[in-house]
Amino acid sequence: MNEAAPLPEAAVVAEKLTKRYGSLTAVEDLSFSVAPGEIVGFLGPNGAGKSTTMRILSGTMSGTSGRATIWGVSVALDPAGAKRHLAYMPENNPLPEDMRVEEYLTLRARLKDVAPSRVDERVRKVMDDCDLTRRASGRLIGQLSKGFRQRVGIADALLAEPRVVILDEPTIGLDPHQILGIRDLIRSLRGQMAVLISSHILHEVEQVCDKVVIINRGRLVAQGRTDDLRRELLPHAGFTVVTKASQAELAALCTAVEPAATVEDGVATDLGWTRYRVVLPAQSPARETLATTLLSAGLPLREIAEERYGLEDIFLAATRRTPAEGRRS
């Protein structure tokens, strides 16, 4: 790790970041932070401004206005100082195909001013951590699969023991097995360094990240832990109920325990069974008692199950919001 320095309240700060290209605004009034040791998912539709924001934070692009800091150091006022604390792996990270893995990482360690006495040690360490020693040692980068090239990119990012790592789409184009390996690798960084990661694979973000920041059209629409966002953005609980009762009979029982309950039109399945969707307020006590209520009433039931909302549902709800609603979250 870099030389000891006071622990800042936030490892990464974006404050009112704005980036304009003439009349086109790519990022507008965007504010969020990443705490030391925290893994944060940075999400948004295509063209939302994610890569632009990451480039501004990494110092590879200047913003039009606003403030960006890495470990308390201004990216605009002291870019070299900020970059000493930072590693950035862009989307489609280019690598020299005619170099061997160890050669490339050794060169990168020297370029990053790793102490000469520690270069070999650091190369061995990141190769071990990224599962490259056993699978890629001595091989040309051009001979590696895309998954292992991504590992080389992440190993490069970790060489100088940065306090902050920014990863733009690190799992793009990988198969499920490769994605799992990268996910475990990123998860292992928790507590050691702050990680900001963008990805379109929402399930992986949900598995790895402590919280998420969601932007749309360059503006913040939601941020926080997924459990908190689920309560905020998805205020209803849905149940699938398969029964032989009529919609009116089911609705009467549901509204008896929760007046705000609704029963959506059913879909006939087979042998007289119908599949309904029952919707309750998310905080309703009836969520805990609905199954017991229906069974106690003698309702013929084949299935009752509560819907589980994931990050995809949160993402869809968030990207339908206005920026003003996002700032209030």
Show the residue positions of the predicted features.
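Conserved NTP-handling cores and scaffolds of large molecular machines
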Residues: K112, M193, V212, L233, ...
